[in-house]
């Protein structure tokens, strides 16, 4: 009888996303949701992002990792889903060892030690540059998306340290981009390509992540009309 009380109180549960956003523990929420007797989900943009990442889309993978890094939630990937971030961490240390990465500081988390924070900032910068490249490659392959204005790396004057756009110049706050080739700024280095191939396999082969995303797909939609109410 005790177990039946929540069912009698809440006959059907609507979850209006995002579930995956800046906060900790979305995998814990998903585990709980999957046990509920009657539920539907209206996806948020971050939920769609993670579904894309689970499908192996590299731009989505890099973006999901970047958000986790920025808000101090890399444990979602490592502990929650068992995704190995060591190759990315090693690459970040080797590439930005002497760079304080002050433009890539963490937000919303005070639980890290100084060394952990420094490591996360380097990983944040590394995956951010990878994301810019991955998205640039996608936009180039699909001009029909009309997203060319989102590509900025080719607007940087690396000799003068400015970004030229719309007839104006903007002083860059950070010019340490050793992995960006000014002649081909959206190309991965061999190390970046290897990291992304590993991460692609890790996301696509993570059983728990795949279960969670299949549940979102089965129970979710962009919007839902319920009792004459629009949920989105």
Where are the regions that the model predicts?
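Feature recognizes metal-dependent phosphohydrolase scaffolds
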Residues: 1-232
């Amino acid at each position: 009888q005790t177990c039946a009380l929540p069912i009698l109180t809440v006959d059907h549960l609507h979850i209006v996303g995002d579930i995956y956003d800046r906060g900790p523990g979305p995998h814990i929420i998903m585990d709980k949701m999957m046990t509920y007797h009657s539920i539907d989900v209206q996806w948020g943009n971050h939920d769609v992002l993670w579904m894309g990442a689970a499908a192996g889309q590299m731009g989505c993978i890099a973006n999901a990792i970047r958000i986790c890094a920025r808000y101090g939630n890399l444990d979602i990937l490592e502990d929650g889903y068992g995704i190995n971030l060591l190759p990315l961490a090693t690459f970040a240390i080797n590439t930005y060892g002497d760079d304080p990465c002050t433009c890539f500081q963490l937000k919303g988390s005070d639980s890290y030690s100084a060394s952990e924070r420094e490591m996360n900032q380097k990983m944040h910068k590394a995956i951010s540059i990878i994301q810019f490249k991955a998205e640039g490659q996608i936009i180039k392959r699909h001009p029909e998306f009309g997203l060319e204005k989102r590509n900025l790396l080719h607007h940087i004057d690396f000799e003068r340290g400015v970004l030229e756009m719309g007839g104006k110049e903007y002083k860059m706050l950070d010019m340490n981009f050793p992995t960006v080739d000014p002649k081909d700024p959206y190309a991965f280095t061999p190390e970046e390509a290897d990291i992304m191939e590993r991460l692609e396999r890790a996301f696509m082969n993570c059983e728990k992540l795949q279960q969670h995303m299949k549940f979102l797909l089965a129970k979710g939609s962009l919007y839902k009309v319920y009792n004459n109410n629009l949920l989105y």
